[in-house]
Amino acid sequence: MSMPTMTLVNQLLIALPSMPDPHFARGVALICQHDSNGSMGVVLNRPSEYTLGEVLFQMGIETASETLREQVVLAGGPVHPDRGFVIYHSEHVWGPSLLIGDGLYLTTSRDVLAAMAEGSGPSRALVALGCAGWAAGQLELELVENNWLMVPADASLLFDTALEQRWQRAAGRIGVDLFRLTDYTGHA
């Protein structure tokens, strides 16, 4: 009899201070896909060097919204750093989108960016360049090795919390003060 598989989709991974990988140190990542082939997520608290206005310009999409043009594009992870990923919260689905949970979607479709530029897109959206990927069993091993804490995703944390506060606030949701933890782990 096989064990049921636990999905990590719609969970936030919070890097513990002992995280050995510099791509994820003090990082918060939303898991968007998780199955027997591996996992995919987007880092939510690393700003890239680009604004959304610069990305839209490169794509030939114009917008009159100064707020949209000034929005920081996230550095979503080391995999496909030249590819755009949009995480949005909406009742409407734009282009091919992956349901993460409870009205939260991930897409690489240009349609959602064009709709946002026109003012008809989702009002709550994050844009990232790149993503994070884990081979089959790799993320589970990292969890066992105490590299990550895990909490359910929360739209307020994703869309209403400043980038520099997401790491500590995510951990605070389960009562953990990351600044009180050491940067090494041990096993009994």
Swiss-Prot record:
Signal peptide: none
InterPro entries: AlgH-like (IPR003774)
Cellular component, GO annotation: cytosol
Gene3D superfamilies documented for this protein: VC0467-like (3.40.1740.10)
One matching Pfam family: DUF179
Family assignment from sequence similarity: Belongs to the UPF0301 (AlgH) family.
Name of this chain's protein: UPF0301 protein Xfasm12_1428
